[in-house]
């Protein structure tokens, strides 16, 4: 099962994207719908709200009078906390039920307006953000929903900023164009990334490596941090720390499109214990341990074809852990070492040219890895 988080600011067109994904076969779990469902007439949720805030929060027909509840529940922090203590567990329980009922091969899209505000992005295998400039969203709310402009501005100001949403976005869906323009983008995303991602997850197979072409990509640092956040949730207390390592950890250094991450653990047993959790987070286990300075207690690879990555789980204090932690810093500060790397990496790029997927990765590694082993011998005495 692939779990996708879908979010966007008010007026961005998130519901439109959700409908397209549903048409393509996704299972949609809409948090707004669930929030209404758990406080419908006759539910334990509504009964708990009445007990907490009084019967005057009910409409004449026995349903929840939302403005009346808001007047009481948002009066102060204590009242808001009381409201959340009632509704959040019920929403969480119902969400878990719906996800649990989905088929094993499902692509589950959780439509969550406050995904960023509630810190839920690392719980998802992938996050889609529907992106529209705030002024455009305000205009849409005023023209198409009849919201007063002052109210629209106030409500948007109370949500996460566009920059905060973009920071968690694995995929940014620009919906600022004409009606219907985003549909083709979503359909291509479904076919090229989401379906293969789910297939890889179900088969416990990492995605094929990315291109071996050397290039600088300003997005890699943010991409790595999103993966680090997911690995931190999956690793829990067993992960002492998680690092972006290797050439892609150096922002201005040309590198192939393969993020390298390292999870540092206390011992080999901890590495073994992470296997299932990392797999569920989108990082299936890989065979082998490697050798020498490139050895790891366990290797995992991203199942996402849109963001190739490898994850080495290494024991704290081992030579291979110390080398991986130090290499990026040395590449940043040692001009001579950078030139060495670039010379070898260009040779590896040439060797991999003409090959694709795993074959290209193997050809690249066959040139790069001996140099890394030699550098490790030089550096380990100093780190």
Swiss-Prot record:
GO terms for biological process: coenzyme A biosynthetic process. It catalyses: 3'-dephospho-CoA + ATP = ADP + CoA + H(+). One of its GO terms (molecular function) is ATP binding. Residues 196-383 are annotated as: UPF0157. The keyword Cell cycle does not apply. Residues 3-201 form the DPCK domain. It is an enzyme of class 2 (transferase). It is found in: Cytoplasm. ATP binds at residues 11-16. Coiled coil: none annotated. It holds the Pfam family GrpB. Its EC number is 2.7.1.24. The C-terminal UPF0157 domain is involved in the proper folding of the full length enzyme. In the N-terminal section; belongs to the CoaE family. In the C-terminal section; belongs to the UPF0157 (GrpB) family. NCBIfam families: dephospho-CoA kinase (TIGR00152), PRK03333.1 (NF002879). PANTHER family: BIFUNCTIONAL COENZYME A SYNTHASE-RELATED, DEPHOSPHO-COA KINASE-RELATED. This is Dephospho-CoA kinase. It comes from Nocardia farcinica (strain IFM 10152). The lineage of its organism: Bacteria, Bacillati, Actinomycetota, Actinomycetes, Mycobacteriales.
